[in-house]
Amino acid sequence: MKLYDSGVYLVNGTELVADDAQAAAAIKSRTGREVTKAGAAQGTIAYGILKDHNVSGNMDKLQIKFDKLTSHDITFVGIIQTARASGLEKFPIPYVLTNCHNSLCAVGGTINEDDHMFGLTCAKRYGGIYVPPHQAVIHQFAREMLAAGGKMILGSDSHTRYGALGTMAVGEGGPELVKQLLSKTYDIDMPGVVGVYLTGTPRKGVGPQDIALAIIGEVFERGYVKNKVMEFVGPGVSNMSVDYRIGVDVMTTETTCLSSIWRTDDAVKEFYEIHGREGDYKELNPAAVAYYDGMIEINLDEIKPMIAMPFHPSNTYTIEELNANLMDILDDCEKRAEVSFDGAVKLDLKSKVRNGRLYVDQGIIAGCAGGGFENICDAADILKGASIGPDEFTLSVYPASTPIYMELVKNGAVATLMETGAIVKTAFCGPCFGAGDTPANNAFSIRHSTRNFPNREGSKVQKGQVASVALMDARSIAATAANKGYLTAATDVDVDFSKPKYHFDSAIYANRVFDSKGVADPSVEIQFGPNIKDWPAMSALPENMVLKVVSEIHDPVTTTDELIPSGETSSFRSNPLGLAEFALSRKDPQYVGRAKEIQKAQKAVEEGTCPVEAVEELRPVMDAIRAAFPEKTFGEEMKPGTLGFGSTIFAVKPGDGSAREQAASCQKVLGGWANIANEYATKRYRSNLINWGMLPFVIPEGALPFQNLDYLFLPDIRKAVEEKQSEIIAYVVKGSELKEFKLGLGAMTDDEREIILKGCLINYYRG
């Protein structure tokens, strides 16, 4: 795999020309014409689709209107509640509500099914589409029923990726979907486009997860595709089936790219024909000369079976490399865990080595990444006639949709898997986010799913539990299962893959999915459960601000799972204040109490009482601020909005992973006004902060001018935002002294600044 250090021209879809002094002459000799870099940049597939959806008239500053929206049951309640509070009357474009996360209805009594009934009644009232539990995971339904060539889909899940079908899809936090529901736009600068040039053919036994992990391992740490579009081109694309391409595509999220798009061919056309939607196919190819801001060149022949060890999809090795350096790599994983868990629990992977081989406790093939038809058929072929054994090792398989499940029943794959001792379950995202198949304490699970962040498999550090997940392809998981849990690459087994043809039966959805066909019925009464709560009132940004640092995180990356846990906690997402009680609970259990304590001062301000009396700790802080800023009238007579109080956290690089808006909104409802970071892991997390009225501060790497529990004073912060200042002066209160330092605000649109000034997106739309 080669990552180019410069931009690259793709000529006639098959030749790469590096952007150097000889590039223009080389291109002219091949095409007979002169091209400019700016002109060639318009030759990417991504540029054409973005142009078709941009309503700003300026291709540097995009205002995108999407064709369709999709959400699942741990995001759609909050989104619709926000939209309702902002004036929603009907869904202006198709909006699909799937119920693939809290499908088991096993936590919190009625609250999960209450959310589902809320979704069904909203689909009826506002004109949406409702997919009941166990019918399909969000992204498989979108592939089967929503994707279309040249279109764009916005989803409230980070793995919203349908590029292999010719659809540019973006995963964002809920507020961005709210904007689309209110017929507003998705505003971004024109993203860079990085080409992924594929040649060769994947070797037998190598699956899409292997290709994806190989890419993630190369690009993540370098930030090579961060917030850019990945465009898959080259002859190697046609050497993969569409199901295979989908398996690679969905994992591009773990590179931190913004979106993805692939060139399309007759195989994609056949996919649409199989699904009864041949009219949605569109041939997509780059222009004769297309310019890319970067290029990843991959010979598919060279990719070997991969494994992403705990606790990140980028912690990748070939299985061959892992087996050759087993104890060293396991030791490294244990040391990383000690840092990540702050010594609260001890991960013991080396005890999994038996007779020089790594033993695995659990295998899972599931969800939008693993639950595809071909993944499961190939796994069944590898396992045919085998037994997974009567010991600790278990294997669970989750087809990504009921149509896939039914076809697997018809062709015998389900029977083959069940005969081995595997359990075949319904379409459910649980194993991907800690709501199903949580392993035993200190167990090691291998999964064809999307992520392996700390505790994402469901373990609870605060209760002394730890388990771990490695990501692998379904084929190597099956090979491991055939060896009763001893880690095995699929290339090490002798198998003939049957490659049965897929037949899609739309009758299942016709019988169970509610489709309003875009017709709203205002007479339908929305069904609310007792856990579904409105968003609490949120104040506008004050003129001046006192912030307490209530958590300080120095991990290289902080995931959204650490900011607000997934798993059973997700059941409470319909209740903003109830969910907030779990914020940072697995990373910093003292965060919630500290945030709520300083929030008392802000509540006192809003009630017209004295903040210092509410939080006695503030007395010397305010004395120091008054002494340093005597011109500021911070006395008992100060008018509302003059001074605000709240909390902030520091993290090196927060926001990797999920699109969940709750990673930000939970901080907000606990009184959070800001984050301070060296950088933000993803555009979507920074957008979530802004949409919830939180300041996304950045500070250079190095020694911090403050520490946890310090108070910070931000004079004239409202004026700084109004005047579009990119840098502000802040002060840390040290005893009776104030020490000055600087914070960056980064680029923001006028609308984003106005959202922060208003206090949140809801206030912004309420006017």
Give the role of each language-model region:
Residues 1-767:
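Fe-S-dependent hydro-lyases/dehydratases of central metabolism
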